[in-house]
Design a protein with these regions (language model features):
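N-terminal helix-turn-helix DNA-binding core of bacterial DNA-binding proteins
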Residues: 2-43
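Short helix-loop hinge/linker segments at domain boundaries
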Residues: 4, 8-12, 96-102, 124
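Charged, amphipathic alpha-helical coiled-coil/dimerization segments
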Residues: 51-111
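C-terminal regulatory/oligomerization modules of transcriptional regulators
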Residues: 104-125
Length: 125
């Protein structure tokens, strides 16, 4: 799609971008792979593949989870943080692919998604 095309110069797909953004927003810049899957609502295999590619590109590193010896953390690197900033600027310029919608359509989508996120506990009203 349009977003993947915009992200291609950064070596990213939208799924990889989402994972990097999630890591960049986390307090420590690192999250367990399991939690990444839960937050992005994707299968563990997809998380593994995404982190593999981001790690290969030098945008994240894997580390043992000090809270769970069986688990692994993905941690964003300085290069990963730089790519998030640059890619976000490009996506913002393209209005995240939402240019074709009228204001009333955007408001309806925002309202619906806000309700879903409040119910999911992402934030309070």
């Amino acid at each position: 799609g349009e977003l993947d095309t915009l992200l291609r110069p950064f070596g990213l797909t939208f799924a990889r971008y989402e994972a990097l953004v999630l890591l960049s927003f986390s307090r420590a810049g690192a999250l367990p792979l399991r939690l990444i899957g839960e937050r992005l609502m994707v299968h563990p295999t997809s998380v593994t593949n995404t982190i593999d590619r981001l790690e290969h590109a030098g945008l994240v590193v894997r580390k043992p989870n000090p809270q769970d010896r069986r688990g692994t953390l993905a941690e964003i690197t300085p290069a990963g943080r730089a790519v998030v900033v640059q890619a976000t600027e490009v996506l913002m310029t393209a209005e995240f692919g939402l240019r074709g919608y009228q204001d009333d359509q955007l408001c309806a989508m925002f309202s619906l998604l806000r309700t879903l996120r409040v119910e999911a506990g992402d934030f309070t009203e």
